[in-house]
């Protein structure tokens, strides 16, 4: 098992962060936070996937996203399922963007019969990450959920002592009962927001240490790809919380017992690095400053795509949800399924998305192992739709 460390000395964290921050600065203003007419400054979270070329020690941002919103499946109309993005938190969107890029590279390899700088064809016929590459994730805020419980409590005006209970049999809202640690939480965290079964970013990132960062589409055609490092701004890190949420001796420790020779999935805890570099549009640490969350989401996918989209309420900005096809983003489930269909019709014969996901038996089995260990992981709704 790879040792988990919180490296406070290495400059790698700054190099990864700067790769994302510099790329964000290069993008056009549209979709970025603004200062509103009443003088209130908007804030958001930025996340980006950075590829490190080991031999050259080069760090390349290949995709990024901003966002802090989540749309519960229950308020999305049936005809819009698969077209609307549910989870618009930056780190989740950035990983969706990376999966879109992987699909594009798979198609390129199929058409050209040649490996790309990102992917190679393995002996078993699946695509695999180039052995010279490492994958990192930068996030400007501490991921919502268990990793940020102590940080959230420290920002409260009434910072009274709270009971440090380690387990619970309940599925908790993101900001409920700070004293309950090491448990699965949902987003949105606010008690006044509509209920969602979407898991916190902490839980989703923890899950990816076992299931890999591949999604339902790419996991069918690619060998698992794992994050090497997650980089966070140093002032949002509470080491004990990070260790508990992600570390090999925290709540994910039992996952180390799984993984066999014929099982491509195994527990791969990422290293958490800190950075001195702060994102210009981050939520201010000074609670006295009046701010508002940005309602826009911005995604950018680089490399061979070089494409930017602004997203509002889970669909392309400037479109209406009733215009189902026109409103679809590059990374919604229907878009990803159509791209996979372009790559392999034999893998996409089942048109019901829920039934199609169940056909990936190996991944479903590994998901159940993960849910049994993390506990209280109730599957999301919103999968009952025809993707084509």
Swiss-Prot record:
InterPro entries, A to Z: A_deamin (IPR002466), Tad1 (IPR042935)
Residues reported to bind Zn(2+): 89, 144, 201
Domain A to I editase residue range list: 63-388
EC number, UniProt record: 3.5.4.34
Binding sites annotated in the UniProt record for 1D-myo-inositol hexakisphosphate: 96, 204, 357, 363
Main location group: cytoplasm
Active site, renumbered: 91 (proton donor)
Cysteines engaged in disulfide bonds, as pairs: none
This protein's record includes keyword Zinc: yes
Stored PROSITE patterns: A_DEAMIN_EDITASE (PS50141)
Highest taxon, organism lineage: Eukaryota
Catalytic class of the enzyme: hydrolase
Function: Deaminates adenosine-37 to inosine in tRNA-Ala.
Family: Belongs to the ADAT1 family.
The protein's name: tRNA-specific adenosine deaminase 1
């Amino acid at each position: 098992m790879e040792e988990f460390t919180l490296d406070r000395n290495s400059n790698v964290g700054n190099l990864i962060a700067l790769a994302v921050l510099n790329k964000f600065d290069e993008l056009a203003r549209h979709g970025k936070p603004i200062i509103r007419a009443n003088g209130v400054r908007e804030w958001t979270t930025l996340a980006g996937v950075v590829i490190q070329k080991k031999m050259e020690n080069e760090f390349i941002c290949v995709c990024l996203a901003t966002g802090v919103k989540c749309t519960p499946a229950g308020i999305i109309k049936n005809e819009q399922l698969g077209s609307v993005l549910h989870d618009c938190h930056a780190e989740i969107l950035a990983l969706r963007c990376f999966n879109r890029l992987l699909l594009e590279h798979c198609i390129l390899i199929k058409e050209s019969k040649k490996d790309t700088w990102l992917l190679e064809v393995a002996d078993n016929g699946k695509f695999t990450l180039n052995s010279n590459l490492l994958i990192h994730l930068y996030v400007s805020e501490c991921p919502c959920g268990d990793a940020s419980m102590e940080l959230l409590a420290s920002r409260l005006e009434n910072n009274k002592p709270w009971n440090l209970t380690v387990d619970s049999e309940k599925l908790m809202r993101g900001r409920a009962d700070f004293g309950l640690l090491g448990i699965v939480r949902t987003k949105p965290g606010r008690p006044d927001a509509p209920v969602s079964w979407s898991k916190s970013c902490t839980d989703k990132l923890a899950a990816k240490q076992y299931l890999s960062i591949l999604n339902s589409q790419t996991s069918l055609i690619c060998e698992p790809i794992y994050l090497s490092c997650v980089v966070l701004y140093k002032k949002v890190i509470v080491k004990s919380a990070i260790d508990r949420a992600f570390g090999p001796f925290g709540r994910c420790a039992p996952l180390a017992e799984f993984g066999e020779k014929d099982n491509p999935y195994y527990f791969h805890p990422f290293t958490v690095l800190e950075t001195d570099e702060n994102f210009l549009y981050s939520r201010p640490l000074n609670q006295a400053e009046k701010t508002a969350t940005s309602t826009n989401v911005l995604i950018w996918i680089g490399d061979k795509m070089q494409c930017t989209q602004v997203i509002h309420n889970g669909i392309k900005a400037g479109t209406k949800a009733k215009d189902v096809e026109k409103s679809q983003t590059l990374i919604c489930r229907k878009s990803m399924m159509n791209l996979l269909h372009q790559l392999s019709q034999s893998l996409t014969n089942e048109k019901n998305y829920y039934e199609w996901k169940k056909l990936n038996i190996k991944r479903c089995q590994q998901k159940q192992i993960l849910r049994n260990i993390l506990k209280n992981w109730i599957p999301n709704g919103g999968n009952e739709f025809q993707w084509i």
